[in-house]
Regions:
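Extracytoplasmic small-molecule ligand-binding "clamshell" domains
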Residues: 56-58, 73-88, 93-100
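Bacterial lipoprotein signal-peptidase II cleavage site
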Residues: 28-41
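Short helices/loops that flank or line small-molecule/ion binding pockets
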Residues: 60, 64-68, 83-94, 110-111, ...
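Short helix-initiation/N-cap motifs at beta->coil->alpha
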Residues: 53, 76-87, 184, 207-219
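Short, well-ordered beta-strand elements
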Residues: 41-54, 72-76, 176-182
Length: 319
């Protein structure tokens, strides 16, 4: 499965390097919407994912873990948004996919910003209850992985230090001097820009540039075409000391921990599925996920290879 696709949420960038590399479509059999089965005679499972690097990696790791246990795996990775994924679950196109607790809370449950739980435990509790109690298509959100992938407001470390910007309060006070590189979904989602401005009312950027490719947002920072950008805390790019995530001291966002959402009917037929999925998620943490994302986005390694190497080293699958 080749990593050669422009990814809406997590395009890659070599900071200080040659910029964005060329991109073509992912191989259909490996990562597209209609990936074929693995050819096993075991129980069937269809694994989906959304359309960015971390999601595709998580989906690929789930797929490889199931294949290692003898399942006949169909990959339907890179499908679309959380709404697309939720519909795919409900109509039986997929059996499971990785979601984020906070994303489900905001986008699937439709909860407003003022109701966001302040703890991951409460976020997960409410989301898991919602999925379990669905009348037509009961599902389970399983135990989350032990890391969060939240929004990250990012600046060049040099710029932030020169302007004494460490927190979003600091940023808001000086925002009229700064250009913000955002993306359409963040500007429109209830947990996005309006939520940030509500909690930090002095926020008033000199200019907001809408850039829907994450890699180009990082490129804009590197080339001083923007002063502030919106990223995600497990982006591979953030391993660079040249970048600084500005602290959110008011905890304005829900908790975004990845966890599999699985059809109850699939779990009923395959009681070992929970253990398989949990073995993948518990092999991860924020540093490991950031490293894996970076291997795909920055080093241009294949999804399959990155997933396999990690799972073998973690003892999740046999080498």
């Amino acid at each position: 499965m080749k990593n050669k696709m422009m990814l809406n949420r997590r395009d890659f960038l070599r900071l200080g390097g040659a910029g964005l590399a060329g991109a073509t479509l992912l191989g259909v059999a490996g990562c597209g919407g209609g990936g074929g089965g693995s050819g096993s005679s075991g129980p069937k499972v269809s694994v989906g994912s959304k359309k960015f690097t971390e999601q595709i990696l998580l989906g690929e790791m789930y797929a490889q873990a199931f294949a290692d246990k003898g399942y006949d795996v169909t990959r339907k990775l890179n499908l679309g948004s959380e709404q697309v994924m939720d519909k795919a679950l409900q109509d039986g196109t997929i059996d499971l996919y990785p979601e984020y607790t906070g994303t489900a809370y905001v986008a699937i449950l439709g909860k407003p910003p003022e109701s966001y739980p302040k703890t991951e435990k409460e976020t997960y509790k409410q989301v898991a209850k919602f999925y379990k109690n669905r009348k037509d298509t009961p599902m389970q959100m399983l135990k989350p992985a032990p890391f969060e992938n939240n929004y990250g407001i990012v600046m060049l470390t040099k710029t932030a230090n020169e302007m004494n910007i460490d927190t979003l309060n600091d940023l808001a006070a000086k925002s009229d001097q700064l250009v913000f590189s955002s993306y359409s979904e963040f500007q429109n989602r209830s947990d996005g820009y309006d939520n940030m401005k509500e909690h930090y009312p002095k926020l008033d950027f000199k200019e907001i540039k809408i850039v829907n490719d994450l890699g180009i947002r990082y490129k804009a920072l590197a080339e001083n075409e923007a002063d502030v950008g919106i990223g995600f805390t497990t982006d591979g790019q953030l391993a660079s000391p040249k970048l600084k995530v500005i602290k959110d001291t008011k905890v304005i966002w829900p908790k975004y921990y990845p966890a599999p959402v699985v059809l109850q009917s699939f779990l009923d037929k395959n009681p070992d599925a929970k253990k398989i999925l949990n073995s993948v998620d518990q092999s991860l943490n924020a540093d490991v996920m950031r490293k894996l994302n970076g291997q795909v986005d920055l080093e241009q390694r294949d999804y399959e290879d990155v997933a396999r190497d990690h799972l073998e080293q973690a003892g999740v699958i046999n080498g």
